[in-house]
């Protein structure tokens, strides 16, 4: 990079947003590519963060961005977003139904990875190896992940998506539970299958029935 690239970046940002301190650290990351091509308005492959947030939770976008080292280019794809969502679904699944607070300290393997020139891909790999829910939450929290309640995570809905409301889903679950209590398993299965066809998956467990959109 040579002058005047990034000239007056702090002055511009402070004037635009009215904050005395925009950031403590400044880094220049690798190119952001979209399906193998550099993102640009001229190529028509440009989209905004707000547009992405209509389709995916913010943590999905964050995880995909962290999946590449900041010095390296990142190929940002829809498949990558789907994979990041699946990863977070697995992690939140570990926390679901449990009152899990993060452990007091960041797991050593995660801390070591971040101390190695912010090696976020290595840190993500270390998080995958954590079996203890409290350690999992602490390690993910260090990357700004697993910040939500697990139930809220699984009930997130994309903007403009069709499907039953939470109240309608809860009413259907109550009707299904009544059918099961009456040993009307045909009706119970019908309600479950109807919800599944509408994009709602039921999961029966020791503490009752939970649901998620998927």
Over which residues does each language-model region extend?
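Helix-loop elements that line ligand-binding/catalytic pockets
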Residues: 73-74, 80-147
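Short coil/turn segments at secondary-structure boundaries
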Residues: 25-29, 64-65, 78, 101-103, ...
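Short, hydrophobic/aromatic alpha-helical segments in well-folded domains
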Residues: 9-12, 48, 109, 113, ...
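Alpha-helical recognition segments enriched in aromatics with Gly/Pro capping
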Residues: 1-99
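Basic, alpha-helical terminal appendages of large translation-related enzymes
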Residues: 124-214
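Short helix-capping and inter-helix turn/linker motifs at the boundaries of alpha-helical repeat units
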Residues: 39-40, 101-105, 163-167
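Generic alpha-helical secondary structure signal
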Residues: 59-63, 105, 167, 171
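Short, contiguous acidic/charged loop-to-helix segments that flank catalytic cores in large enzymes
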Residues: 78-81, 114-117, 160-164, 178-179
């Amino acid at each position: 990079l040579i002058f005047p690239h990034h000239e007056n970046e702090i002055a511009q940002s402070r004037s635009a947003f009215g904050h005395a301190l925009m950031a403590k650290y400044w880094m220049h990351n690798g190119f952001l590519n979209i399906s193998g091509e550099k993102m640009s308005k001229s190529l028509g492959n440009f989209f905004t963060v707000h547009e992405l947030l209509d389709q995916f939770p913010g943590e999905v976008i964050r995880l995909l961005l962290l999946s590449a080292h900041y010095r390296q280019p990142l190929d940002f794809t829809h498949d990558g977003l789907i994979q990041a969502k699946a990863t977070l679904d697995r992690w939140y699944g570990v926390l679901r139904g449990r009152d899990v607070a993060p452990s007091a300290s960041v797991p050593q393997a995660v801390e070591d990875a971040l101390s190695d020139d912010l090696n976020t891909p290595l840190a993500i790999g270390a998080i995958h190896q954590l079996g203890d829910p409290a350690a999992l939450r602490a390690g993910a929290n260090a990357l700004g992940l697993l910040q939500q309640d697990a139930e809220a995570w699984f009930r997130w809905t994309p903007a403009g998506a069709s499907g039953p409301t939470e109240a309608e889903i809860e009413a259907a679950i109550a009707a299904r539970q009544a059918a099961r209590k009456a040993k009307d398993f045909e009706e119970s299965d019908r309600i479950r299958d109807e919800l599944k066809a509408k994009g709602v998956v039921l999961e029966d467990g020791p503490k009752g029935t939970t649901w998620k959109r998927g």
